[in-house]
From Swiss-Prot:
Source species of the chain: Burkholderia orbicola (strain AU 1054)
GO biological process entries: methylation; tRNA wobble base modification
UniProt keywords, alphabetically: Cytoplasm, FAD, Flavoprotein, Methyltransferase, Multifunctional enzyme, Oxidoreductase, S-adenosyl-L-methionine, Transferase, tRNA processing
Reactions it catalyzes: 5-aminomethyl-2-thiouridine(34) in tRNA + S-adenosyl-L-methionine = 5-methylaminomethyl-2-thiouridine(34) in tRNA + S-adenosyl-L-homocysteine + H(+)
EC numbers on record: 2.1.1.61, 1.5.-.-
Name under which the protein is recorded: tRNA 5-methylaminomethyl-2-thiouridine biosynthesis bifunctional protein MnmC
Name of encoding gene: mnmC
Amino acid sequence: MPDRLVSATLALRDDGTLVSPEFGELHRGASGTLARAHRTFVAGNGLPARWQRRRTFTIVTTAFGAGAGFLAAWVAWRDDPARCERLHVVAVEPHPFSRDDLHRAVSHMVVDTTISADVDALLDAWPILVPGLHRLEFDEGRVVLTLAFGDTIDLLKKLVARADAFFLDGAAASGDGIRALAKLAGEHATFATHAKSDDVKHALGETGFTFREVDDRLVGDYAPRWRARRHEPPRALPVAARRAIVIGAGLAGCAVVERLAARGWDVTLIERHERIASEASGNPAGVFHPLMTRDDNVASRLTRGGFLHALARWRALERAGHAFSRSTHGMLHLAESADDFARMRDAFDAFGPPSDYATLLDADAARAHLNLPVAQGGLLFPHGGAVWPAGLCVAQYAAAGERVRLLASTCVARLERRDDTWHALDDTGATLADAPVVVLANAGDAARLAGLRHVTLQPVRGQLTLLPPGTTAPLPCPAIGDGYAVPLDDGTLLIGATFEPDDTDPAMRAAGHAENLDRVRHLLPGLIGALPDPATLRGRVAFRWVVGDRLPLIGPLADETQATANARALGGAQARDLPRMPGLYGAFGFGSRGLVWAALGAELIASQLEGEPWPLERELADAVDPARFLIRALRARRVGSAG
């Protein structure tokens, strides 16, 4: 059963002081909390001098609280003309405030009106209070706050980052917390803390930190006398120039293009069709929602993270003037049976989500919400819905601006690496494009291009059906269950879709329309009146590519040849132990969840390339690692010399 996220609370003392049982008194005034945060944490870590003229700088703060440490770092960064190009702050918080309480808390401790716009931006971006990592961007993406909601020690052990400075506070000022931080520390990382107990000093010393007392705080450096870590924190990929090739211009590829361009990369986008979003990404709409299970398993956590990250990225696109069509009235996931509704209820009760994430509706409430008869209740996701995927791809492509070059109607026959550069070749052997980095986002063809023998992708044919305007009852929001129904802007109702593994026939079938009609009639009995002749209906056929474990393939690709040659030594390997193809990454195998996973996958790849903190926990990154099937084969002694 998942650990519920319990938010912090605020109270007002008789003397007017605002207090939080979790954080104590919140001091008012410029000489109070914010100034102390600057003195203790910012100055205590030698900032701003240490981040000057660097490309990126990463701070890990172990207790976000009301955001004083983050705001102090942000203000110092903006005031420094020699600041780093990109400032990352990773902040762990077991008991986050609600947006309203955070507003009260910050307003109470900050009286400097010059940062009121920063406070407003933080409040506007404040995420839904559910466990996991939440990435927020400010100052046009140059200041990045990654909030980690949940148990402090547990999350510190799961973070992937190379920290340059630690703001050490809260539960992390302990032996377990400091040991977790030591695994994140980059060379010459520094720390500052108010904690000065003997236990803290002992933990710092035994994990490689030097320390000294300065006024009311402890400061120091990570300077181990011997190597004590099996794995070093991630570094940026060394490249002579920030240039990349992305193959495939669907949801996965366009998301990668936008994220790389935002970091200053020049990208060549290669697409075999005449235009972007021509395959499954060209469907009139796709449904978009998280997954909820009683045990909050890997798929649930990954889907939740992808869902919330995509929402944040889409809002950023819209604010930048790159709008696209998407529904805004939520989505209802209807149970398929009484047993299915019981499972939904168990998952909802175990997770305990806030109402802005999900609400459980019984059959009567679901009926009232849709104004249609339904057999069962379900889960209402107020931020779920339907998205026009091609419009999203166009928006992401437009956001990349002059940093992207499109080669349409172009097929890549093979990849070849010469020195430190990848070459994309056509069937004559001519070079189409070259770059130090290639990202394969071309679904079923990715494994062939990369020569992956331990990845198996299965094609799944999906046929959707379009019902003309005026032939169905009004539907206020998309509904899914065993099938789905999505109202489009022009009054057309999209229903579907068939699920036909290993069927690669692109022709439309009347039988597929009949199957979709039958499925939706059971889902929403009052939606469709007189059944139309399936042979007269319009629709679309597209193909999704799925992996056996139904999780995507995102990240650096393994060097299978080298791994095979060293199979015996790699029999107990972790993902970090495997040899990788330098500069070759994948983002494919998304199945029917491209809308949910594409943005998060793109952010992960961009973060891996740049040596930035990852936007998801190590366990989840390992779960989508394209090398995971090779790892399983190595452990089972089914590879090369291990066999």
